[in-house]
Amino acid sequence: MILIKKFIVAIELFIFNRNNCRYILLCTDNKVKNIQTSLSICILCAISYALIKKIQQTFQLSSKFAASCS
């Protein structure tokens, strides 16, 4: 069981960059007993981070476009 836990944590660290979100630290938190919960938090966080980044890029593009029009 411990080996499986370590393997899943390794996968989580590989898939999700730990610097992307502070909640990613929950992936490697030994206090998190439920692996499924930990993985779900990481996935939700990764999706949220990706959406926020996409929104930021969209706003940057629209503000550049607005600046070029004025």
UniProtKB/Swiss-Prot annotation:
<keyword id="KW-0934">Plastid</keyword>
<protein>
    <recommendedName>
        <fullName>Uncharacterized 8.0 kDa protein in ndhF-psbD intergenic region</fullName>
    </recommendedName>
</protein>
<dbReference type="GO" id="GO:0009507">
    <property type="term" value="C:chloroplast"/>
</dbReference>
<keyword id="KW-0150">Chloroplast</keyword>
